[in-house]
Swiss-Prot record:
HAMAP family: MinE. This is Cell division topological specificity factor. One of its GO terms (biological process) is regulation of division septum assembly. Belongs to the MinE family. Disulfide bonds: none annotated.
């Protein structure tokens, strides 16, 4: 009765609710980033491609045609996932 009166039970409920919400957020982020649990989102794939281009440009000259022809494939299997990147350059 006193716990109810002073709201002591609410703290446990709030903690449980916060924990549940945090678990949902973490699971959502894992699904977005982990290829085996879901496909990589097109936004994440585009961002990955842009970053790869910037790194490759540090070492190799790429023309606009080379950049346009970059091919990224994501393959999933039961054991692992792979990202294959093909970058044509002269």
């Amino acid at each position: 009765m006193l716990a109810k009166l002073f709201g002591l039970g609410k703290k446990q409920q709030s903690a449980s609710l916060a924990k549940e919400r945090l678990q949902i957020i973490v699971a959502h982020q894992r699904n977005e980033l982990h290829p085996r649990s879901s496909k990589i989102s097109s936004h994440l794939l585009a961002e990955l491609k842009d970053e790869i281009i910037e790194v490759v440009k540090k070492y190799v000259a790429l023309s606009e045609d080379n950049i346009r022809d970059i091919d990224i494939k994501v393959e999933d299997s039961s054991k692992n996932s792979t990202i294959e990147v093909n970058i044509p350059f002269n």
